[in-house]
Amino acid sequence: MSGVNDIRSTFLDYFKKNGHEIVPSSPLVPRNDPTLMFTNAGMVQFKNVFTGLEKRPYSTATTSQKCVRAGGKHNDLDNVGYTARHLTFFEMLGNFSFGDYFKENAIELAWKLVTEGFDLPKNRLLVTVYSEDEEAATLWKKIAGFSDDKIIRISTSDNFWQMGDTGPCGPCSEIFIDQGENVWGGPPGSPEEDGDRFLEFWNLVFMQFEQTEPGVRNPLPRPSIDTGMGLERMACILQGVQSVFDTDLFRTLIGTIEDTMGVKAEGSASHRVIADHLRSSAFLIADGVLPSNEGRGYVLRRIMRRAMRHAQLLGAKEPLVYKLLPTLVQQMGRAYPELVRAEALISETLKLEENRFRKTLERGLSLLSDATTDLAKGDMLDGETAFKLYDTYGFPLDLTQDALRAREIGVDISGFTDAMQRQKAEARSHWAGSGEKATETVWFELKEKHGATEFLGYDTETAEGVVQAIVKDGAVAAEASAGDKVQIVVSQTPFYGESGGQMGDTGVISSDHGKIEISDTQKRGEGLFVHQGTVVDGVFKDGDAVVLTVDHARRSRLRANHSATHLLHEALREVLGTHVAQKGSLVAPERLRFDVSHPKPMSAEELKIVEDMANEIVLQNSPVTTRLMSVDDAIAEGAMALFGEKYGDEVRVVAMGEGVRGAKAGKPYSIELCGGTHVGATGQIGLIRVLGESAVGAGVRRIEAVTGESAREYLAEQDERVKTLAASLKVQPGEVLSRVEALMDERRKLEKELADAKRKLAMGGGQGGSVDAVREVAGVKFLGKAISGVDPKDLKGLADDGKTSIGSGVVALVGVSDDGKASAVVAVTPDLVQRYSAVDLVRIASAALGGKGGGGRPDMAQAGGPDGSKADEAIEAVAVALAG
């Protein structure tokens, strides 16, 4: 039962038997929580439940939560590999009560699992409680039979948890195990508490207060429980090891590294770093994070590049980390099926990133070596060099620090920061200054003054409103007249502001006094709609009553294209796998494109199936429905939330089509959180035509398509091309393909005949230089010839012909191209390869042509040189070598 997978199952099954709902791990990217970069605790997905903002259909739960601590204030990256317990990725086991049971039940459940489920010896266990929580101390005595010396009272914040400056909070009780006198350290609260003898493995948080302001706490009417047990730490205890890297899961991963690299671990930090970083990288990619130069993507890139640097330390000359992925999937795929679903994407992303970084890694390490040649233990690398490594070679600062760690050389962080700030200042100085920053202040002030614009565009394309502000050249203006380019804010609008990939609406704003042609609509700040346009005639002022009219035809095409992206997105997930997630989109009137996570190009057959599946839903002409609900309710119903999008408390859920196969049969085909405009029924899309797909980055593919009238125009153009081609070929349109194939066969035949004729002409003396074609040198037949205008790739074929014609001997040919460069081939017949090496002879010819090197086999070798005028001299040089 002591294996990692067994421990996880034992924990979850125990709490399930005790009435808890097993809730799947939430993604590593927290939903709707901008305060966190990554999920780092089990309670994160329940934060709104604890605060009362969200209701769940259960009052007790248990989870095994994926967690990452890298980046932000919770960052263990620098320590991983060098300590026994630091990890960037770990699993947090937990049980939770949302106003159900409280302190006594929580302690009793924990005690029974620890002593009966995990069979830990009672005499080695002890606990801490908050110094003011006498209730917890009394309960531990009652339930566990602990004496006072086994209950340690802690007065610091270590044993009092709070969500923030305000909100739910409460005392903690931590469970420790004594690992024995042979391990250094003292009990919690003692001067030696940082030692490893007394190991904390489970923290029970009793949420019983609400803090309304610092120091002011009121009892909660329904207190709750939040607990967290580190899975890897419990594995250490049950498996009797001091380091997480000696547990079964890590031993397997490290064993795969040893087998792949042929290098034993023997306490190597590099093996540990690679094993841990593979886990965090794989799970982050599976949850939608891809390497980039900002935000979460940059943290992932730092983790990946640190692993790659340690792979290089082990001697890796080719990408290594992706080769370890199957072992991880085998170990953890059953508990986390997203790893299995995204395996191809993870593998390709790791491989692409390793290939991209490998060359700069070598150059950067060379620069680092040169820069630190004269540095000794305790010295500091200057910040300028560290910044150059970051800026030019893609070395994150922590990678440079890690590379110097073994030599105990530090990095001047202040100097690094100064260098970065100087670069930013220089970049700003080169900026022409569009006034955008000042304009952003204007929008903030207008939002504060007028509030958000009321959007009416889901229900109408025409509305009346009142002008609230006119902005010209980045500043609020009193009025605008004919010819002025303006940005205008109105009290309410049917115009859609660009967001979610959908372009903003165009149209007309008119009044009794004039007209403004609107060329774009944008959103500024939180919900301020800004209409950009030109005053055609009249004068406009604040307070004017206006009529806003959206360009109906353009909006209709935008609706069709936006709805088509939803259908294509779902079809892609069905055809390629559920790892497919939208990474960006453009919904324009005439076309659409969107980027999705997928590791490799799609085949023509896959594109056709995706297109057919989407059009199948179009032909249903089924209604498109929209509903408002909470994010969690929407996701519970199967709605897809797009990675990186921020959602409010209430979201708009768009559903369309009816599934006809598999698990979706009879259910909505596509259901997504979306604030865009859509068709009323799928038939209004008309037709979807996929134009193609391409790469836009590591693990990201771009799909482009047209719909409706644009699709009809595209197909009409294609049809016209086929008719024109058929007329040129003098066949019917349906016969074009067979006629083209026949012409291609005929062309290949003629090209072969032409090549044969060229070879015969070349070897027959018609294009040769001044050297005799065949002669005897040192008793060996030697065919040496310089040939003009021959393709270098044909030289080997000519050399083979030459060998056939002379039977036994050496052939040396030099081809001179139109730009004066030369290619040389030397061939030796089988009976002479022990005497002459074609490689040695072709290098002699190359030297005569001003080149270097050359290579091949003993019987056939090729080289080149820049000086074709020395072709005859190259032939003679080979002849001299034969005679020598």
UniProtKB/Swiss-Prot annotation:
GO terms for molecular function: alanine-tRNA ligase activity; aminoacyl-tRNA deacylase activity; ATP binding; tRNA binding; zinc ion binding. Its EC number is 6.1.1.7. It is found in: Cytoplasm. This is Alanine--tRNA ligase. Consists of three domains; the N-terminal catalytic domain, the editing domain and the C-terminal C-Ala domain. The editing domain removes incorrectly charged amino acids, while the C-Ala domain, along with tRNA(Ala), serves as a bridge to cooperatively bring together the editing and aminoacylation centers thus stimulating deacylation of misacylated tRNAs. One of its GO terms (biological process) is alanyl-tRNA aminoacylation. It comes from Rhizobium johnstonii (strain DSM 114642 / LMG 32736 / 3841) (Rhizobium leguminosarum bv. viciae). Binds 1 zinc ion per subunit. Pfam families: DHHA1, tRNA-synt_2c, tRNA_SAD. NCBIfam families: alaS (TIGR00344). The gene is alaS. Keywords: Aminoacyl-tRNA synthetase, ATP-binding, Cytoplasm, Ligase, Metal-binding, Nucleotide-binding, Protein biosynthesis, RNA-binding, tRNA-binding, Zinc. SUPFAM superfamilies: Class II aaRS and biotin synthetases (SSF55681), Putative anticodon-binding domain of alanyl-tRNA synthetase (AlaRS) (SSF101353), ThrRS/AlaRS common domain (SSF55186), Translation proteins (SSF50447). Its cofactor is Zn(2+). Catalyzes the attachment of alanine to tRNA(Ala) in a two-step reaction: alanine is first activated by ATP to form Ala-AMP and then transferred to the acceptor end of tRNA(Ala). Also edits incorrectly charged Ser-tRNA(Ala) and Gly-tRNA(Ala) via its editing domain. It catalyses: tRNA(Ala) + L-alanine + ATP = L-alanyl-tRNA(Ala) + AMP + diphosphate. Zn(2+) binds at residues 562, 566, 674, 678.
